[in-house]
């Protein structure tokens, strides 16, 4: 393994440095990668291994990569680590989530400014009292991009704030089946009282790697639904359409490319 790890081709994502752009979009689902890559110019698949499907094209003349991370913090952290080894330094996670705060409804976009570290991966990167925060410039670019596609209508809005990252999907959606359900429900209640916007599984790990490796990271999530709104008797949408989040991420990369050029 040492000889493979020391080589130029990355051990898990199987890319070479020349395969990867400075700017990277990180969906979780490998099947979503070709859809995102269609929004780039001249995109081609450069690697595929395990949960990692990797395409690279150009945007505004700059090389941009799309790489899936699979589900959860460990595989997401591996992807970011190896993409950084190939020269990437700017990452936008795009994914789906379950709404938490009552102002978030299904179909809304959530731009993550930070993530609750309710998972285990970040403990390998950050002290327990260090926050998993997104890069301000990436958050700002996502905000400006979201403004182009959003309205004040339910299911077509955007929000910026703290998201919840977890390890167990079913621990959240079916806590009654867990022997530690009291702890799960108590933490969930605390996160709701703190105004956490939505729950997902990768942002904290991606942000933590970015902090430690000095890379710029952010995330934009589609809220699929919000069970808390349903509990409160409020109207809610249910959707699996991630097209707005994809467009937001691509437009944010455009903004960052332009500003990086202007500030070079």
Where are these regions (language model features)?
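Flexible, glycine/charged-enriched surface loops at secondary-structure junctions
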Residues: 43-48, 150-162, 256-264
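Zn-dependent metallopeptidase/amidohydrolase metal-coordination segment
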Residues: 204-238
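Active-site rim beta-loop-alpha module in soluble metabolic enzymes
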Residues: 132-195
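Generic non-transmembrane alpha-helical segments
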Residues: 141-152, 209, 248-259
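Short acidic/polar active-site loop segments enriched in Thr and Asp
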Residues: 89-90, 197, 216
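Metabolite-binding pocket within alpha/beta catalytic cores that recognizes anionic/polar moieties
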Residues: 1-145
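His/Asp/Glu-rich mid-to-C-terminal helical/loop segments that flank catalytic regions of hydrolases
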Residues: 227-264
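Conserved active-site and cofactor/substrate-binding residues in soluble primary-metabolism enzymes
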Residues: 27-31, 71-78, 86, 133, ...
């Amino acid at each position: 393994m040492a000889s493979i790890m020391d080589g130029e081709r990355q051990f898990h994502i199987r890319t070479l440095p020349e395969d990867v752009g400075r700017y990277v979009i990180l969906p979780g689902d490998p099947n979503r990668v070709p859809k995102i890559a269609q929004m780039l110019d001249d995109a081609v698949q450069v690697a595929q291994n395990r949960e990692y499907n990797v395409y690279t094209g150009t945007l505004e003349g700059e090389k941009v990569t799309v790489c899936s991370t699979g589900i959860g913090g460990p595989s997401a952290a591996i992807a970011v680590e190896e993409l950084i080894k190939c020269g990437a330094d700017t990452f936008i996670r795009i994914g789906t989530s379950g709404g938490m705060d009552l102002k978030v409804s299904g179909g809304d976009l959530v731009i993550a400014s930070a993530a609750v570290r309710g998972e285990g991966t970040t403990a390998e990167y950050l002290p327990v009292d260090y926050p998993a925060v997104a890069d301000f410039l990436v958050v700002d670019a996502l905000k400006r991009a979201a403004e182009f596609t959003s309205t004040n209508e339910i299911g077509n809005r955007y929000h910026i704030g703290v998201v919840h990252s977890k390890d167990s999907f079913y621990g959240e959606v079916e806590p009654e089946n867990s022997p530690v359900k009291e702890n799960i429900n108590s933490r969930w209640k605390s996160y709701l009282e703190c105004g956490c916007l939505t729950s997902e599984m990768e942002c904290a790990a991606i942000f933590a790697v970015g902090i430690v490796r000095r890379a710029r990271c952010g995330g934009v999530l589609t809220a699929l639904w919000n069970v808390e709104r349903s509990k409160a008797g409020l109207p809610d949408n249910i959707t699996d359409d991630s097209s707005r989040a994809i467009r937001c991420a691509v437009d944010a990369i455009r903004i960052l490319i332009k500003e990086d050029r202007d500030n070079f």
